[in-house]
Amino acid sequence: MAEVHRPRGVPRHASLLVSLCFGILFVAKTLGQIQGSAGQTDTKPFTASVALREGYDSNPLTQSYQSTQDIQSSTYTSIQPSLGYNYLGMQADMALRYDFSGTYYPSINQQYDIQYAQTFTGRYTYAIDPRTSFTLGNNFVYTEQPLVAQFVQAGISPTFNTSTINNLATVQADYRVTDRLSMITRWNNTLVYLGGSSANNNYMNNGAFQQFRLDFTPETVGTFSFDYQIYDYDLDNTYRDNQQVAFSVGADHTFLPTLFFSGRAGLQLNDNFGLADNDFIVGNGGLGSGEQEIGAFPFASITGTWNYEQRSFLSAGFSTQIQQSNQANASDSEAYTLNLNWDHYFTDKFSVIQSFFINVATFTPQLSQEQASAARLSYQGSGTQTTVSYQCKFAYEFLPYLSAELGWSYTSYGSYFDVNNSNNPSYNRNQVYLGVRGTY
């Protein structure tokens, strides 16, 4: 993908952002006068919002604290407009949304001092009858100098690429076989294209998902799921092509109308067939065999949600998974993830939103140091990678369409191994901001 250069001169960007802001508000006001043709009641046919923020970032380039260079900090200005359309009909409903996020770091003063992301989301659902419905969905994300939040949740250190394209398309069918038995069938396709030095990580993912849901009681639903995914890399110079099959059982239980729990446990099988092309792999047949035994690894997760007030809720989730490496010379990993979310309204106008995420992954090498040396491979030994993210935002609504925001976010990523410790990506980052948000 061709490299995109920003225009020279900050005033040009400033005028563009201001024009975009006023343009969105004007369009929202105009479209808001159009009545929905399907008899919408509570849902507005058109929605619009825009947030303007001024803040400080302690480490916008996610520089490692192990680096010999001074970590560069910067103030920043960001704009986040959003447009949405909702249609509700007798048999069909549709939702479209466009989100933009742009941030300017004046202290960086380089080509990448402006970072932005655009997201297009669409969903269309058609109900053939009360028992059967089909849903088409698509989520398209384009970023220029990718935002850190998109990488942290995946447990990896962000890399500054020229551009990133990520598209997820889904087709889903929901069908109730009997009064107690229902099914969900879904196909997914993911395309990932990365620019710059990460272009060799481009890949396509196709998958199929089937779930059976049995209503044991009005409060308890049992599930059995089958999930198949295949990954195909454009430039597979590291032999990463693989396929995964997962089986799981679980249950969803409603203790109270406001208290809900869900749990899953299963087994995942990995077939790293891309290794068959690697002449240096130490497999079951010895050096150069290009073989790796299909691994079966367990996983489990549990989540809970408590809606204790009309607009306030508390949710938590925990999961654990053992993942086989897609290279025989690398390490298997065992990961633990914890998520916490809390939205609370102190009054009708004053609220707080908090989220906490932590992922701890431990790695165990498949080869000894002697085997790795014989295969001319690097060896790092055992290691641990830890990702922590916390976000907090206070909001006060002055008017029904205007509110003030005060927020803080913290991100930490650490990577440590016994041998040849490559912890250069390890970093800490703090962001604080003050802003306003207009909504329609």
Predicted ranges, named:
Residues 31-440:
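Gram-negative and organellar
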Residues 1-12:
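N-terminal secretory signal peptides that target proteins for export/translocation
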Residues 9-11, 17, 52, 358:
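Alpha-helical and His/Cys-centered functional microenvironments
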Residues 15-25, 29:
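Bacterial N-terminal signal peptides
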